[in-house]
Amino acid sequence: MNYEYYYNNVPGQGLCRNNLIYTSLISTDKKVFVQWYHNDTEYHQGKNQVVDPKKMQEKWEREILFIQQLVGTGIAPKILKVDPRERKIFLAIDGPDFWEQAGCDQANYNSVLPDWQDQMINIIKAHKDRGWHKYSMHPSSYFVVDGKLKSINYFFTYRDTEPNISIADVESHIYTTRQDEMRKHLNTLGIEWDKPQPWLLMDQLCWESFSTNYPAEFIERVKCLK
């Protein structure tokens, strides 16, 4: 099977890398997505941010830890293969990601999947029920397979039993535009950038920062989840 780099075609920006951590690959028949935990300079267009090998290894280990726990739940895509030597995860998909199918525009989400809000809420609630805090919540972190959302990108996920972290600890893999959105809410939420914060407060900041990617009513629904 042949693979190629996978990008999101963002209006006004053109082809953009799919994430800041790994190198995204897709099969030419658009049926397999590969998370390749490798710092590929060509794919990242010289804008590599996670260049510390230890950090990359940690992200790989988190991805494997969490996504393998979802096998059989229907929450994540089917894992076709894991190559620990190459640090690759092969996932069964059915075309481009949710955001890409919507033309990278939240106005089109309903046309891709009319009940996307309910489906995404159910996935987020399932994470909460497991005591997980997942911060890679961009709409490109979902694929649609047989009419069902499938969640990926667990490299930015923590258990509520883990020590708290600060934003500064993880800013290397947060887009600068996302950081700008986060800074708008620091004072309101009483958050200091370089000090560890309670997980629930970090959850709230995360969702406040996604106001340009999701409708306001959806974000309010998420914030009400217990």
Where in the sequence are the language-model features?
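Short, flexible/disordered intra-domain loops and linkers
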Residues: 42-58, 103-108, 162-169
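ATP-binding glycine-rich loop module of kinase domains
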Residues: 6-64
